[in-house]
């Protein structure tokens, strides 16, 4: 609800920036940052580029996948990649800042991070969300393979250094992938 007829106060965050408070002018849509709690620290940190990529799945659907590159990324070098497996099983991989699963921190250690919005995550329609129900080792796991296979085909990925990470349902996913990955992953 607006605090007056033309202004909203909101929190905004991204993979590269923790929560800050902003004002949105409802008339001209101007956004003004009100808090700068993390500015001094963030000004000293180089974040990796975040890329939104739509990857084809094994059943020919498009899946939003976030790619986070290491800071100072050089496309002429080879990088290891980490597949981020979201928990839940029904919570989306959005532009979020996390102290627990900070994808920028992982990228800062030289990894390309692959974070797909596999089946079972909301925000992509009811069919996409419900597909996982009763099919935990099914299409959503194929979605993970689609994401890592698409990214490992890039010339800057060392396909002999692929890993997968996750907790909660993401941890279940790691164990499932460990038994079915056909030698894709090393860790």
Language-model regions, residue ranges each:
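Serine-hydrolase catalytic core recognition
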Residues: 1-187
